[in-house]
Amino acid sequence: MADLSLLQEDLQEDADGFGVDDYSSESDVIIIPSALDFVSQDEMLTPLGRLDKYAASENIFNRQMVARSLLDTLREVCDDERDCIAVLERISRLADDSEPTVRAELMEQVPHIALFCQENRPSIPYAFSKFLLPIVVRYLADQNNQVRKTSQAALLALLEQELIERFDVETKVCPVLIELTAPDSNDDVKTEAVAIMCKMAPMVGKDITERLILPRFCEMCCDCRMFHVRKVCAANFGDICSVVGQQATEEMLLPRFFQLCSDNVWGVRKACAECFMAVSCATCQEIRRTKLSALFINLISDPSRWVRQAAFQSLGPFISTFANPSSSGQYFKEESKSSEEMSVENKNRTRDQEAPEDVQVRPEDTPSDLSVSNSSVILENTMEDHAAEASGKPLGEISVPLDSSLLCTLSSESHQEAASNENDKKPGNYKSMLRPEVGTTSQDSALLDQELYNSFHFWRTPLPEIDLDIELEQNSGGKPSPEGPEEESEGPVPSSPNITMATRKELEEMIENLEPHIDDPDVKAQVEVLSAALRASSLDAHEETISIEKRSDLQDELDINELPNCKINQEDSVPLISDAVENMDSTLHYIHSDSDLSNNSSFSPDEERRTKVQDVVPQALLDQYLSMTDPSRAQTVDTEIAKHCAYSLPGVALTLGRQNWHCLRETYETLASDMQWKVRRTLAFSIHELAVILGDQLTAADLVPIFNGFLKDLDEVRIGVLKHLHDFLKLLHIDKRREYLYQLQEFLVTDNSRNWRFRAELAEQLILLLELYSPRDVYDYLRPIALNLCADKVSSVRWISYKLVSEMVKKLHAATPPTFGVDLINELVENFGRCPKWSGRQAFVFVCQTVIEDDCLPMDQFAVHLMPHLLTLANDRVPNVRVLLAKTLRQTLLEKDYFLASASCHQEAVEQTIMALQMDRDSDVKYFASIHPASTKISEDAMSTASSTY
C-alpha cells in the first residue's frame, strides 16, 4: 500500500516528470527504476578513497562510522602492504579528532585491529608498535573521561592477549604510567593510572613489576594528599604481593601495608581487610603468625563497623593461610604399599633433597638441612583405616603431625623408644635423640631470639639445668629394659610425643605468676588450662603416682643447654603449656587417630571448653572466629556474619586438623541450629567436605546428627544435602549408611510440588548411590523411588529417571543370581508396558531405548525379556507411542550388531514390526520408521517428544 501511495503522489507531479521514465499507451504500464539501478559515487571509490572522504566529513556520525569500519577496510586491503600502511596512517590522523566520541569509538576498535595486525604480521611488521600503541598510551591522559576509560580497557585487553611486546611495555607503557602518577599529576588521572599499574602487574610478570612498578606503587601507598590513591593501592595490595613474591613483600610492601591498615580513612582500612588473605599468602609462616595476626586483630576491633565487617568476612580465609599438611593431617598414602616399604622409600627420597611437609618420614630420617620454621615430622600413618596396625607399632611410629615447635620438644618417652629400636637400646643414645636433628639458619635464629621474650617465658619458673647423662646413669644404672616401652604403653602413660615441662608444684607457681595478667585473653586461657590440669592430676594422683614419678624424673633430667637451636615462639607458648598438661593426665593427651578422638569421652563439658587450645593458628584469631556466632556480633558488625562463619568453616577445620575438631564442634552445632535458613543452607552444601576432613569416626559422632536435622529442614536447606548425598554417604560405615535407605523416600515430598529440580537432583543422586548398596537394598528401597520418578509430571525428571532405571536393571541383572533383575523387568512391563495411560507406555519405550543405548542388558537377554513387550506397542492407539517405538527400533535397536549379524527369529520380528510401522496411518510414524538411522539424532528427537508430553 505504501508503494501505491508513493506512485499516486508521483503521478500528480506531471510538471516535474520526476520518477517517470517511460509511458506506454498500449500497455498502460509505468516503469519506475529502483535506486539500485544507479551506481553511487561511493561504489566508484576505492576503500582508501571512501576512508578519506568520510574521515574529512564535518558530520560527527560519518567520522564515527569511519572508526567503526576501520577493521573492515583493513581486511579489504590486507593483500597490499602499502594500502595497509596507508590505513594505519589514517588511523593516526583520526586519533587527533576533536570529538571525544570519535576518539572513544576509535579506541574500542584498537584491540581488534591489533589482533588483525598480529595475524598478518609478515605483511605489516611492527604495525601495532608504531601506529596503534602510541595512541593507546596517549589516550591514558586524555581530558575526556570516556576516552580514558576506553583506552584503559584497551590496554588491559592488549596485555591480556599478549599483543604488546615486552620491550614496548618497558619503554612505552610503564614510563607513561609512572609519569601519570607523579605528584603534580591530575588527581583523577593519577588514581586511574595507579589502578592500571596494579591490574597490569600480573600480566607483565615479576621482573617488570619489581623494577618499574613496585617503587612507584610504594610511593603511592604513602600519598598523604589523596586518600583515593591509597584506597586503590590497598584494594590491589594482594595482587602486587602475589606477583613480586615473598622477599619483596616482606622487605618493601609490608611496612606500607601496616601504614595502610592504620590509615585515618576507614575506606582504606576496609580495603586492607578485604585483601588480607592474599597478603598473608605472600609471607612466611613466622611473619604471618607474629605480625599479621596482631594487625588483623586490630582490624577486627576497628572503630568503623564497615572495617569490622570486612575483617570478619576475611577472618576465615586468613586462618586458612596457616594450613599445612602436618597440622591438617591430610596427605596421600598408597594403600597397596606396606608401612615398612613406605618408610624405606621415604628414607631414600630424603637423603638427597629436603623433605616436603606432606611426606611421611621417621624422626631419625629427617635431613639435617631442614629449617625449624618449615619442618614437620610426619610419622607412620595411623588414620582410622589403619587403627588395627597402629596398636601393634612402637610408640615412636604413631602418626602425629608436628609443627616446628613440637619438633624441638618431642617427649622423652617417644625418643627413648625410638632410640631403643634403632640403636639396641643403648643409654648413651638418649642424649643424641633428644638433641634436635634440624638446623636453623642465622636469620631464623635471630627471629626466634627476638620472640624468646614474651609473657609466658617472662613469668614462668625457669627449668632446672641438670646434666642429662649423669642423671640417666644414676637412675638407670645400665641398659634400659627391653620391655620398657611395652610396659609404658600398657600403663596409664599417654602416648603423646610431648615434653612434660613442669611438676605439679611448678604448675601452681605458673598460675600464681600469671594471675596478675589475667586481663590478657591469652594469659586467661593459659590459666584455665593449667587449673584444669591441676584438678585432673589431683583426682588421678593415686592411680598415676608411679608413672608421674618416672616422667618427672625424665623431665628434671632434661638439660635445656642441649637444645641450642630450639627457641619457643610467642604464639607457640600456649600449646606447649597444654602439651605439659596433657602429659600429666591420661585423659588429656594429644590424639591424631579418629577412633581415639571419637572414643575420648572423659572430658566434662567445662573441661572440654577450657581445653580449646591449639598451636596451628594464633589462639586470638581462633577466638575471634568462634565469636562470630555470638548474637551480639550480628547487631554490632553484620547481620550476615553467621553466614560468613559457616562459609569459612570447612577451610578453618582443614587448617586446624581433625585433632583440633573439638575447638570447632560447639560452633558448628550453633551454626547448624541458626535461625537463618541461609546459614544452615551454607553448612548443608559443605557438610560432605567437612566429612572428608574429619574422617568416618568423627563424622559418625558429630556430623551425622546434624545431617539428619538437615534432612528434615526447609527445601532450601535439603537441596544442599541432596546435591552431595552420595559424597556424604560413601564416607559412612556400611551399617550407618543403610539407615538412610529408609529416609530416601522422604525426598519425594517437597514444600512446593512445582520444585521439580529437587526431584531431578534426587534421580541424579540415586544413580550414584547404586554403587553403595547391595542388590537387595537397591531392589527393596531404591526401586520404588525410581519407578515413582519415571511417572513424574515433568519430562526432565522422567528423562533422568529412565537413566536411573536402566542403570538399576544393569546392576540387578549383573548380580548373582539375577533374580532381582528379572523381577524389576517384569515390574516395568506390568506397570509401564501395559499401563492404561499412554504416557506410561511411552515411558516403557524410553526405558527400553536407554537400556539398549547404554548396553545395560546383553542383547540376547533383552530380546527375551523386553523386546516382545516392546513390539506389541506397534498397535498402540496413541501415535506418540508408535512414533517413539519407530525411532527406537530404527535408530537404536537395528544399530546393534546382534540384530545386524544374526538371522534369528528376533531379527525377523523386528523387521516385520518396522514394515508395519512404515504403513502406519500416521505420517510421523511412517517417516521415523523409514528414515535412515544416521540421518537424525535419537536423543534430540526423543527429547522433543518427551517435552511435548509435559
Curated annotation (Swiss-Prot):
UniProt KW keywords: Phosphoprotein, Repeat
Taxonomic superkingdom: Eukaryota
Gene Ontology CC: cytoplasm; protein phosphatase 4 complex
Tissue: Widely expressed with high expression in cultured mesangial cells. Isoform 1 and isoform 2 are expressed in renal tissues.
Any matching Pfam family: HEAT
GO biological process terms, semicolon-separated: protein phosphorylation; signal transduction
Record's compositionally biased regions (Basic and acidic residues): 332-365
KW Phosphoprotein (keyword) present: yes
Modified residues (Phosphoserine): S935
HEAT repeats, residue ranges: 1-25, 26-63, 65-81, 82-119, 127-164, 168-206, 208-246, 248-285, 287-324, 505-542, 568-606, 698-734, 799-837, 861-898
Location of region: Disordered: 326-374, 413-438, 473-499
Keyword Transmembrane helix belongs to the record: no
Gene3D superfamilies, per database record: Leucine-rich Repeat Variant
GO molecular function, one term: protein phosphatase regulator activity
Disulfide bridges in this chain: none
Subunit structure: Serine/threonine-protein phosphatase 4 (PP4) occurs in different assemblies of the catalytic and one or more regulatory subunits. Component of the PP4 complex PPP4C-PPP4R1. Interacts with HDAC3. (Microbial infection) Interacts with merkel polyomavirus small tumor antigen; this interaction bridges small tumor antigen with NEMO to inhibit NF-kappa-B.
Biological role stated in the UniProt entry: Regulatory subunit of serine/threonine-protein phosphatase 4. May play a role in regulation of cell division in renal glomeruli. The PPP4C-PPP4R1 PP4 complex may play a role in dephosphorylation and regulation of HDAC3. Plays a role in the inhibition of TNF-induced NF-kappa-B activation by regulating the dephosphorylation of TRAF2.
PANTHER family cross-referenced by the UniProt entry: SERINE/THREONINE-PROTEIN PHOSPHATASE PP2A 65 KDA REGULATORY SUBUNIT, SERINE_THREONINE-PROTEIN PHOSPHATASE 4 REGULATORY SUBUNIT 1
Name of the protein in question: Serine/threonine-protein phosphatase 4 regulatory subunit 1
Source organism: Homo sapiens
Gene (UniProt): PPP4R1
